[in-house]
Amino acid sequence: MQFLWLCLLSAVTLQFTGTLAFYPIKLPDFTKGLVSNHGSIDRRFFTFPGLYKHAHTGSTTLNIRRGPSNYRRDNNYPAQIASPPTAPNTLGINNDGYDFSYFSEVKVGSEGQKMWMLIDTGASGTWVFGSDCTSKACGRHNTFGKEDSKTIKVTDEKWGVTYGTGKVSGVIVNDTMSFAGFELVTPFGSASTASDDFLNYPMDGILGIGPQDPNAKTPTVVQLLMQQKLLKSNVIGINLQRASEGATDGQITFGDIDKSKFSGELIYSNVVPDGYQWEIAMDDLIMDGKSLNLKGRTGIIDTGTSFLILPPADADLIHSMIPQANKGSGFYTLPCSTKVDIKLSIGGVEYTIQPDDYVGNETATKGTCNSLIVGRQILGPKQWLVGDVFLKNVYSVFDFDKNRVGLAARKYAGTKNPPSSTPSPGMFLLHAILCPKTISVLMLHIDPTSNKAPSGGSPGLPAESGSDSTTNGEATNGATSSPNSSSSVLTPTWLTLAVFFAIGSSLWS
């Protein structure tokens, strides 16, 4: 039985508290509105079998990073490692080998403790598992604390994230974080307790690179980089590697744009008015050349979300255009051979979403796969959560000074049919209301030593580096305001995606 777990989550500091609510909702009755009437912070969890089409990648060989016992305990996570970066201020972004999560290595403290951090444009706060944590989940991850650094300063400011079956909580600490050629003293959360849910989380923490609420009292990592004038330009450029292409050029560039990663020019869209996330206006969705007339939609551009998540009515319309697509038990299904041409139009440009990215794993019915375009009413009636299903097809730029997002068609070396972008006949712009900040984390249950499905244990992921950077021309459209490794053949046995929504208040307020 599949379930959709709707959980109200509160993020707390000394200045902010919240309440907890838990809403189990059986699937496939997923067309009912799930937007909570509660204030503060909302979290919703999607639980389902693995949605990745196994035939999509065939047998995927992944590097398994194994370090000394004092470096990583038993958390040897599989990953497709990005190539070491050659450009300054660039950090490699790795993936789990199945294109569900993207993460990088960050060194923390005076001794440079290595932590695998989820790269998240939907969050502004940063946190790690603390070494004083005795929870089982912390034992499966790298942790960081007083014994790992001579420069750490522990505050008495409480910090925590509470959700349905458990929580992560601790205090705010201050110490050095080193990444992409920067060494930055910054505040971040240190988790001293963590629920068993985190046994399945691949990351040791989250590196939040989303925009901050202007009322927040604590600066974010990106704000500190800008305040100290460490960036050539106050932009961040991201390209996510696609495992099925064998690509290893995933990277995030701080302060610059890598022209080699995209074709054509970057087209910019302004963030919607009063938006405290990377939310931009979208024009339409085009399928096999036919406009669906999905006007007035906005999308939160979120590297931390695996799927394309949109209101059920929009998902229904999209799947009505796919031959033999059916509303299955919680998710749409479609023929695994589906090749419908899907383009998302943003800023007057149509960006292709490859079938490999929206067609998921095969179901119990041979030849039938799950769709990774998911219908859920988790945001507003015209708001979409635009995650990695789309973002693997583009190079994305996040401009903090001009409060805008730039997109261009992504280049994949050696790809016969790379993602493309073509001008659309016109665009419709909408000023959207303030909507939730978004971060997401997924869980993979994988046996890191064989291709047999394990009966228990933890999933996988690590991280390393990737690529070069140059500047380019630009165009604008948008809303008018405002350390040894080995290899194994791995097959995912199940997947849980947790999509987090923070409403109205920052974790760091």
From Swiss-Prot:
Instruction: Give the EC number(s) under which this enzyme is classified.
Output: 3.4.23.-
The reply to whether Signal figures as a keyword in the UniProt entry is yes
Q: Name one GO biological process term.
A: proteolysis
| Family, per entry | Belongs to the peptidase A1 family.
Can you tell me which residues the record assigns to a coiled coil? none
Q: Which CDD domains does the record cross-reference, listed alphabetically?
A: pepsin_like
State where composition is biased (Polar residues). 466-480
Q: Where is the Peptidase A1 domain?
A: 102-408
Q: Spell out the molecular function terms from Gene Ontology.
A: aspartic-type endopeptidase activity
**Lipid-anchored residues (GPI-anchor amidated serine):** S485
- GO cellular component terms given for this protein: plasma membrane; side of membrane
What protein am I looking at? Probable aspartic-type endopeptidase CTSD
The positions making up the signal sequence are: 1-21
Q: Where is this region: Disordered?
A: 451-489
Name the source organism. Answer: Trichophyton verrucosum (strain HKI 0517)
**Active site (UniProt):** D120, D302
Q: What class of enzyme is it?
A: hydrolase
State where it is primarily located: membrane
Glycosylation: which residues?
N174, N361, N484
InterPro entries attached to this UniProt entry: Aspartic_peptidase_A1 (IPR001461), Aspartic_peptidase_AS (IPR001969), Pepsin-like_dom (IPR034164), PEPTIDASE_A1 (IPR033121), Peptidase_aspartic_dom_sf (IPR021109)
Pfam families recorded = Asp
Q: Which UniProt keywords apply?
A: Aspartyl protease, Cell membrane, Glycoprotein, GPI-anchor, Hydrolase, Lipoprotein, Membrane, Protease, Signal, Virulence
The cellular location(s) given in this protein's UniProt record come to: Cell membrane
